[in-house]
Amino acid sequence: MSANAFGKLFTVTTFGESHGPAIGCVVDGCPPGLEIAPEEFSHDLQRRASGKSRHTSARREADEIEILSGVYEGRTTGTPIGLLIRNTDQRSKDYSNIAQQFRPGHADYTYWQKYGIRDPRGGGRSSARETTMRVAAGVIAKKWLKQRYGVLVRGFLSQLGEIRPAGFDWDAVEDNPFFWPHAAQVPELETYMDALRKSGDSVGARVDVLAGGVPAGWGEPIYGKLDAELAAALMSINAVKGVEIGDGFASAAQKGTEHRDLITPEGFRSNHAGGILGGISTGQAVTASMVLKPTSSLRLPGATVDADGSVVDVITTGRHDPCVGIRATPIAEAMMALVLMDQALRHRAQCGDVGEISPRIPGQVDV
């Protein structure tokens, strides 16, 4: 009804606001018997967390997960899994001066128009704080996918402003606060972000996410297409303004002889389609990209109106990310994992009796 839940068989419902006492989620549809412990959530939650470097928001939350239900003696029971994280570092006073003002480029105005009431503290429900629980739910999905099917979901920052990676190394991604795949460029990113922060401005970014090991057959035509649901999932992340599957918009400049992924008994010779054809996985890596707009909460004055319709200049003094894309990689990974787990369970429910289909084409091969 009010779109706080996600998924069909494997569902996630989140609740809470940025400056409320807690945020949480209910994960339903997880098969029983999956081993899970509170400490397993820490890694991805800390990857998403702010306050880990000078290039993100200074807000520091412990993000300690509490498992309220659905787990007994360290294993899922098949019943709803309740997860809770208590907020501990709110500074609501930072928003007292703009409580009646609509920040340009922010959800303040649209929430006001929809509900006639809004929580101005940290953006309330529209804050990216909500994505903490998506990442928590994603921990469950990632683990189940890896154990059950060998699927590995991972992502990286593929553009910061106008800067693009000059090389690629997965090992470098987890060794810097940007999730950047080329270690030699990290000093350049730091210099760029230092100058941006001093200027009081913000910048956009792009994140790439992929899942390797996805079997052929996941996804439902026509309205439950894997790429359609993946695009919707990524678009639901705060500040995302565009999503591509595979080559995405670059496909407009390609010819059919270039874009089609030729098939051989040894495997596909390319993956322009992003591992999805007809809304169904091909067995190749599922690849997607998302673009995030620049943060709208700035220290630089901007023209707007207040709740009375009066013209004012708004200046945001709270703690905000100069680039929300820096922390978006684990969020994108979580959303892809949630979509894949839901699709896997739906495929198993409908097609579990379908035997091995020949020929079974391996994933992409080098040419």
UniProtKB/Swiss-Prot annotation:
It comes from the Bacteria. Belongs to the chorismate synthase family. It catalyses: 5-O-(1-carboxyvinyl)-3-phosphoshikimate = chorismate + phosphate. This is Chorismate synthase. One of its GO terms (biological process) is aromatic amino acid family biosynthetic process. The keyword Amino-acid biosynthesis applies. PANTHER family: CHORISMATE SYNTHASE. NADP(+) binds at residues 48, 54. One of its GO terms (molecular function) is FMN binding. Residues 39-60 are annotated as: Disordered. Its EC number is 4.2.3.5. FMN binds at residues 125-127, 238-239, 278, 293-297, 319. This reaction introduces a second double bond into the aromatic ring system. CDD domains: Chorismate_synthase. Pathway: Metabolic intermediate biosynthesis; chorismate biosynthesis; chorismate from D-erythrose 4-phosphate and phosphoenolpyruvate: step 7/7. Its cofactor is FMNH2. Reduced FMN (FMNH(2)). PROSITE patterns: CHORISMATE_SYNTHASE_1, CHORISMATE_SYNTHASE_2, CHORISMATE_SYNTHASE_3.
